[in-house]
Amino acid sequence: MDFDAIVIGGGHAGIEAALALSRLNFKTLMITQNLDTIGKLSCNPAIGGLAKGNMVREIDALGGEMGRIIDFSMIQFRVLNKSRGPAVQAPRAQADKLMYQTKAKETLERQDNLDLFQDTVVDFLLNSMRNEIEGVVTERGNKFRSSVVVLTTGTFLRGKIFIGEYRADMGRLAEFSAYGLDKTLLGLGFEMGRLKTGTPARIHKKSVDFSKTEVQFGDSDIIPFSFSNGKLDKSQLSCYVTYTNKKTHEIISENMHLSPLYSGEIVGNGPRYCPSIEDKIVKFKDKDRHQIFIEPEGFNTEEMYLNGLSSSLPENIQQKLINSIEGLEHAVITRPGYAVEYDYINPIELYPNLESKRVKGLFIAGQTNGSSGYEEAAAQGLMAGINAALRLQNKKPMILTRTSSYIGVLIDDLVTKGTKEPYRMFTSRAEHRLNLRHDTSDKRLIKIGYDLGLVDEKRYSRYLFKESRVEEIKELLKQRRLSLKDVVDEQLKKHVSKDFYHILKDPSISLDNLIKIDPSLSDSKVILEQVELDVKYEGYINRQKDLIKRLDNLELVKLPFDFNYEIIEGLSREAREKFSKIQPATLAQASRIPGIRSTDITVLLIYFSNPKNKVVINFSL
């Protein structure tokens, strides 16, 4: 059977890729090993967090689905870093795992132009003359033809799980690995490696003594992840906090030789910023305790997730170390923790549009690219789906810049630097994070989603109304002046005769203070928060915008794909090798490649400034 596009895998990357392609009116097929595990939250039952929550809102602004699914399935909501500045605040929600999964599958099943099929892809159909994808072959011998393929295998490509001495060819506990494509990819010359991740044990709620733990409530005011949702009124479940102790650490240290992480069994690098409890004990010997979050997995399950206690130690040792923790003395394990090792492709094998440099029409997204996390996977899946659709239309790729989004930072880091360990997004990876606040995701990206056709007219009109109202309130603030009779407290006295706009810049004055004086300024919480942040941080934002404008000038220098950098005189040997391998899309990307000198960038600029070299440069530094 023929399709326009095929998506391999039903995880978070696959979901976004399949929906983007089908919503852009391309006949799409998703092939996954088990239709009942589409959208499964394999590890922690949560979406969002620092930088990750921003990405979920960016996905939503572009027309993706993750924000709507978590809004539907959340069981607790919190804004992280509330006491700190807006640049590092982020929404995070606990999810009902089964509800999330069910909603994801239902969304796919009801989508026009999209078929789902349960099978395992083992090979590609290729036009070897043009080095171009033409479809896939499955384990059962089915052949499906298409012009583009999006590969999102997650942890399943030659996946292997470890629990003490137990080994099994699985991508998740009780779910078989995928074989076949690994040989195809190696045969095509892809640079591949092994990575490792892990998950903690789950325990039964009735076996926890919550009186010995600290309760963590959700926020009463829920900020929807999706801009299409208004106020959310949800029942929320609490999370709980406890800590490891000296006894816990002794148990782990005494049995470290039984951990496949330290016995040499696992060769793949694990996530630096989400280490196993074994790693924590080895690398942070000075710490006498580590925080553990006991998180519910849903409304209709008694299983609890032990966030911070990922382990691949033998099951009896996991039981001992868990029972050594306060509140968990009688905890009953329902599922053991384990490590999983899997194949990945070095992402420098990809262009910035996530298309493979080796095979035309093959796009790759998610953990297959060396990233870690549901949100990182979904972001790449959406961008791969969008760019696969643009390729089908013979249109230019859509590449988000580092200054426009966390998604842009994510993909640029991956395809420019590659990775040797699971890549996780942080606010610190973005040079201009004040410009990438989660509340401005629609302002930055919704026009792109609208122009693509992934954001409908109704939703875009609602955004335009919101923005016009924000600007209207700012104008009212500039026009309204504080009179002596308005002063109700000492803080305002020094601002008499000033306009409200400049008064609001005072850190000690909130917009609520001014609304009490003039109720006509009142509006929805979302609009008022954006107004206040825009005004208070206007100076910082404008300075960042000036810097971004200068940096974006380098993005305007587009470099040709498949270019022979050996012909450019004056480049260092290292620059020639790295430019030839990575094939940067812009001068800005070239400048971010590790090891590249400023002189190499100058040489490129001079070379491509020559009109005969067919690169149009339109900027002024």
Swiss-Prot record:
GO biological process: tRNA methylation; tRNA wobble uridine modification
Binding site for NAD(+): 270-284
Gene3D superfamilies hit by this protein: FAD/NAD(P)-binding domain, GidA associated domain, C-terminal subdomain, tRNA uridine 5-carboxymethylaminomethyl modification enzyme MnmG/GidA
Keywords on record: Cytoplasm, FAD, Flavoprotein, NAD, tRNA processing
Keyword Cytoplasm found: yes
Role, per record: NAD-binding protein involved in the addition of a carboxymethylaminomethyl (cmnm) group at the wobble position (U34) of certain tRNAs, forming tRNA-cmnm(5)s(2)U34.
Family: Belongs to the MnmG family.
Protein name per the record: tRNA uridine 5-carboxymethylaminomethyl modification enzyme MnmG
Taxonomic lineage of the native organism: Bacteria, Pseudomonadati, Spirochaetota, Spirochaetia, Spirochaetales
